[in-house]
């Protein structure tokens, strides 16, 4: 869109209106040492064709999943997104991040969020879902705060291998929440040790947290973990991948009090870290403790069904000391894309996506394990992601594979660990999997 600068006369009028003599007086409070003293180093003025050409040239330096075969995972996955998802979400009545405060003119958006909440409750086997969170990490951290508030206890126990970035977000949230503690359970064969967990959970534990599948892609012993939490009066919090729930048991069915997840894998493209989607669901007992907002169904004065924002227990709407969270917005557009995708897939569709991802991941893992020098780091069951021990550094494999237009996976050395984390989605073909194995063999 064109940008037309303000004229000198317009600037003078604005300064006069706010009672400031000149521009220098307007910025008098900004310290001299941080003021810009030189002209900005900008491109010369261009027409639209020139700007488009320049941006395309700059973007061509990116490596993206549209022109690379991707085995990247670790929280963001290359699942297929039907074109209809973007088409529907891009309709003008939906394409906004603005909160639908005016219910009378926002019934379409409110109903879409209501449907999102309903779908997530069915997928996760829970009673209530909020209108969305920033991402999976913030959803888990908010879940921990719910547990602290509900139980009045101070301790959080992480039962298995949580995503390192999620752990950092959790620590940051709890650091600001006062005298709280986080204890990490020991690992055996890539999953949390149930025996060790028994000794860690006590009457001081507010919640036991588990990620399913975990950061390594392995499946944790969630039923045993949940039983330990319940036995000690702690809340059981599960961070579950939504695609995995096409084949794995829903958290609510094995006793989760709160279930959260990262919704990127359903309807939201990988986008250099965001915007993504935080899913947060709870049992009915905790409905008044959830952060953000809910959309509820009601009746108007004529008896017609209508949708409204309800239970907005955030600090913008109620007294600060009574608020459940200071979250100030949500990811409504990302949530919309997610519910559109899941609605297009249906129950059988999400099961098919999960099943094909799982089968292809296991095929690839078996092939890689046959290569000299390569092996699976863990023997625990996994969904669509696994860790490979390699004969050469993972960084070398990733660098060499990029030359072949392949994202080989995630190098775990970034977190002080050995191994290559490989993820497989339904998009990968047998030819791509076999080619990947051949390239690994050549590098070994």
Swiss-Prot record:
Pfam families on file: GDC-P
Enzyme class: oxidoreductase
Enzyme Commission numbers on file: 1.4.4.2
One of the protein's GO biological processes: nucleoside metabolic process
Record keywords: Oxidoreductase
Catalytic activity: N(6)-[(R)-lipoyl]-L-lysyl-[glycine-cleavage complex H protein] + glycine + H(+) = N(6)-[(R)-S(8)-aminomethyldihydrolipoyl]-L-lysyl-[glycine-cleavage complex H protein] + CO2
An example molecular function term from Gene Ontology annotations: glycine dehydrogenase (decarboxylating) activity
Cross-referenced InterPro entries: GcvPA, GDC-P_N, GDC_P, PyrdxlP-dep_Trfase, PyrdxlP-dep_Trfase_major, PyrdxlP-dep_Trfase_small
Family statement drawn from the similarity comment of this UniProt entry: Belongs to the GcvP family. N-terminal subunit subfamily.
Function of the protein: The glycine cleavage system catalyzes the degradation of glycine. The P protein binds the alpha-amino group of glycine through its pyridoxal phosphate cofactor; CO(2) is released and the remaining methylamine moiety is then transferred to the lipoamide cofactor of the H protein.
Subunit (UniProt): The glycine cleavage system is composed of four proteins: P, T, L and H. In this organism, the P 'protein' is a heterodimer of two subunits.
PANTHER family the UniProt entry points to: GLYCINE CLEAVAGE SYSTEM P-PROTEIN, GLYCINE DEHYDROGENASE (DECARBOXYLATING)
Annotated NCBIfam families: PRK00451.1
Entry protein name: Probable glycine dehydrogenase (decarboxylating) subunit 1
Organism of provenance: Chlorobaculum tepidum (strain ATCC 49652 / DSM 12025 / NBRC 103806 / TLS)
């Amino acid at each position: 869109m064109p940008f037309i600068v303000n004229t000198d006369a317009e600037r003078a009028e604005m300064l006069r209106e706010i009672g400031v003599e000149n521009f220098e007086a307007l910025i008098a409070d900004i310290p001299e040492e941080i003021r810009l003293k030189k002209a900005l180093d900008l491109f010369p003025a261009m027409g639209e064709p020139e700007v488009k050409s320049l941006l395309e040239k700059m973007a061509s330096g990116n490596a993206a999943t549209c022109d690379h075969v991707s085995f990247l995972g670790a929280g963001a996955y290359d699942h297929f997104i039907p074109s209809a998802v973007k088409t529907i979400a891009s309709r003008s009545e939906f394409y906004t991040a603005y909160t639908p405060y005016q219910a009378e003119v926002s019934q379409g958006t409110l109903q879409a969020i209501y449907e999102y909440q309903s779908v997530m409750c069915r997928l996760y086997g829970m009673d209530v879902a909020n209108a969305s969170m920033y991402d999976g990490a913030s959803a888990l951290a908010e879940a921990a705060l719910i547990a602290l508030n509900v139980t009045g206890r101070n301790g959080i126990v992480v039962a298995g291998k949580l995503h390192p970035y999620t752990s950092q977000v959790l620590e940051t949230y709890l650091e600001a929440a006062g005298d709280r503690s986080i204890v990490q359970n020991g690992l055996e064969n890539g999953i949390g040790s149930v025996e060790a967990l028994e000794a860690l959970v006590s009457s001081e534990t507010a919640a036991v947290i588990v990620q399913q599948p975990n950061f390594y892609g392995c499946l944790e012993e969630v039923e045993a973990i949940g039983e330990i939490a319940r036995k000690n009066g702690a809340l059981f919090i599960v961070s579950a991948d939504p695609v995995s729930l096409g084949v794995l048991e829903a958290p609510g069915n094995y006793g989760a009090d709160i279930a959260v997840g990262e919704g990127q894998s359903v309807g939201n493209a990988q986008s250099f870290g965001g915007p993504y989607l935080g899913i947060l669901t709870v049992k009915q007992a905790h409905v008044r403790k959830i952060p953000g907002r809910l959309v509820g169904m009601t009746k108007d004065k004529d008896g017609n069904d209508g949708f409204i924002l309800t239970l907005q227990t955030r600090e913008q709407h109620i007294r600060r000391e009574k608020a459940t969270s200071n979250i100030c917005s949500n990811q409504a557009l990302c949530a919309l894309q997610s519910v559109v995708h899941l609605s297009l897939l249906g129950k059988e569709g999400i099961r098919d996506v999960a099943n094909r991802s799982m089968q292809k991941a296991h095929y690839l893992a078996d092939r890689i394990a046959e290569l000299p020098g390569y092996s699976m780091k863990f023997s625990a069951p996994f969904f669509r992601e696994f860790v490979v021990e390699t004969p050469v550094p993972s960084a070398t494999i990733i660098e060499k594979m990029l030359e072949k237009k392949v994202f080989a996976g995630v190098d775990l050395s970034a977190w002080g660990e050995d191994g290559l984390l490989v993820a497989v989605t339904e998009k990968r073909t047998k030819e791509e999997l076999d080619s990947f194995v051949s390239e690994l063999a050549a590098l070994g």
